[in-house]
């Protein structure tokens, strides 16, 4: 297998994995964070949250009338802790947003841009050959081997007197078209699996209620007419 195909498959697989794990990425980024700010802020937030919970439990266990001074003192502590926790939440959000931006830049530089460069550089690379030039019409062969730009460039080349098929030495499917078909197939399979496996089943009662509402709506519209 040619290195171009291997590289293209690598980028497709990595991008799909990132797409499927998008809901967990923030937790992973925070867990393996190299930023000392997020680590220290998270520890401080956990410490103050535990302290707030302890004071709340203590206030619930005592009577405000019998232990008014202690109850009031705890309330003042809770108010102070709420302010500190709110400040920590704000600082944590800023730190996490900054780290997410760094991750997105890293993804752009290591995945998105290299994949785009590969498609632009090797977009016309023939992944596999077509037996003969007569297998498909000339325009279809042109699109398969040259990409979708073949169609808008066709009249321009015709007016300039350039043969649009002069570069098609061997008919085949180019990398750009192959990647388009591959990603479309993956998306279709993914959609079917979601619908068959992960889509919640609508109960008969819900269906019957929906039908009743539709009938009532039609009856109301008929009465209005």
Swiss-Prot record:
UniProt-listed InterPro entries: Get1, Get1_fungi, Helix_hairpin_bin_sf
Any single GO CC term annotated in Swiss-Prot or TrEMBL for this entry: GET complex
Any one of the GO BP annotations: establishment of protein localization to endoplasmic reticulum membrane
GO MF annotations in UniProt: membrane insertase activity; protein transmembrane transporter activity; protein-membrane adaptor activity
Localization of this protein: Endoplasmic reticulum membrane; Golgi apparatus membrane
Keywords from the named record: Coiled coil, Endoplasmic reticulum, ER-Golgi transport, Golgi apparatus, Membrane, Transmembrane, Transmembrane helix, Transport
Coiled coil segments of this chain: 37-104
Cytoplasmic membrane side: 22-107, 190-225
Stretches that traverse the bilayer: 2-21, 108-128, 173-189
Lumenal side: 1, 129-172
Membrane protein topology class: Multi-pass membrane protein
Function: Required for the post-translational delivery of tail-anchored (TA) proteins to the endoplasmic reticulum. Together with GET2, acts as a membrane receptor for soluble GET3, which recognizes and selectively binds the transmembrane domain of TA proteins in the cytosol. The GET complex cooperates with the HDEL receptor ERD2 to mediate the ATP-dependent retrieval of resident ER proteins that contain a C-terminal H-D-E-L retention signal from the Golgi to the ER.
Assembly: Component of the Golgi to ER traffic (GET) complex, which is composed of GET1, GET2 and GET3. Within the complex, GET1 and GET2 form a heterotetramer which is stabilized by phosphatidylinositol binding and which binds to the GET3 homodimer.
Family per similarity comment: Belongs to the WRB/GET1 family.
Protein name, UniProt field: Golgi to ER traffic protein 1
Gene (name only): GET1
């Amino acid at each position: 297998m040619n290195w171009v195909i291997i590289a293209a498959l690598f980028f497709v697989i990595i991008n799909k994995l990132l797409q499927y794990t998008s809901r967990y990425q923030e937790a992973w980024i925070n867990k393996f964070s190299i930023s000392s700010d997020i680590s220290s802020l998270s520890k401080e937030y956990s410490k103050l949250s535990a302290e707030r919970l302890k004071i709340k439990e203590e206030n619930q266990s005592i009577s405000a009338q019998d232990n008014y001074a202690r109850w009031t003192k705890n309330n003042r502590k809770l108010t102070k802790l709420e302010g500190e926790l709110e400040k920590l939440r704000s600082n944590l959000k800023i730190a996490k947003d900054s780290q997410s931006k760094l991750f997105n830049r890293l993804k752009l530089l290591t995945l998105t841009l290299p994949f785009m460069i590969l498609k632009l550089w090797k977009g016309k690379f023939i992944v596999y050959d077509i037996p003969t030039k007569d297998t498909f019409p000339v325009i279809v062969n042109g699109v398969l081997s040259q990409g979708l730009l073949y169609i808008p460039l066709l009249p321009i080349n015709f007016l300039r007197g350039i043969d649009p098929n002069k570069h098609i030495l061997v008919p085949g499917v180019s990398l750009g078209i192959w990647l388009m078909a591959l990603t479309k197939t993956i998306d279709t399979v993914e959609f079917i699996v979601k619908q068959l496996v992960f889509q919640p089943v609508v109960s008969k009662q819900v269906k019957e209620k929906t039908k009743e509402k539709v009938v009532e709506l039609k009856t109301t519209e008929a009465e209005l007419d």
